[in-house]
Amino acid sequence: MTAPLPQGELTVARMCALTALSRAGYYRHWQASAPREEAIGVRDAIQRIALENRHYGYRRIAKQLGREGFAVNHKRVLRLMRQDNLLCLRKRPFVPVTTASKHGWRIVPNLARGMQPSGVDQLWVADITYVRMREEFAYLAIVLDGFSRRVVGWALETHMQASLTIAALKMALNGRRPQPFGLVHHSDRGVQYACADYTRVLDEHRILASMSRPGNPYDNAKAESFMKTLKQEEVDGSDYRDSRQARNAIGKFLETIYNRQRLHSALDYRPPAEFEANLPALHPAPRQRAANGERTCP
């Protein structure tokens, strides 16, 4: 026996009788309209994600759709984005910038070359870039984990003194507390990284220093790639009134958008914070110090 319907609810047969439509015709219409409604939902989601992440390409948007429960491949996303004129503008090719390294401070060899970290806090990469404001420039120093790509330290000031890079390094140290002798810190040969004040902090925390070869920014490719992303997705096109506004806006991008929301292709399209949260342990096992590992400041 069929259970009684709630008062006011119509059966399919009753609706078909009232509209002079056969039941077969009703189901044909329903089956044809369902994919159209699903396509509208996918298109709406693509538009929302593209507007919220204006530098996402179709592959990242396809990955985000998958995280939201949509079963759609990147080719379909590309087609829909092309139809809706949502494709990003073609990015300019990456042009590396060589850092001047003519100074009298100690230069150390490149320990990071060929290194393949297997966990966090085994390799940190550091770099500096400029930030254009209305009337002057500011300078941003970052420390990036070479395994998870997470920004673990940063500082922004209107000068390029060693205190800028030291502030970024100390933020990373306070937040991560790496194991002694288990971490390589890689940078270019800039004076801010080679000077005694900076290397003293590395020595105090038993961190092994590493530097790029002269005139070869590709030795620090992970940091350079991050700076390119930062410029494209936050700095370029922004109108920072002063260093305070720049610090607030860039800090939000680093801590919230980049670390916690932006999908990273090297992490199987996961944000760095999520990638780290799924690792079995935060710190690697400490390594033994090499016999010739003693380093002193100049």
State the predicted function of each range.
Residues M1-P298:
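Charged DNA-binding/catalytic regions of mobile-element recombinases
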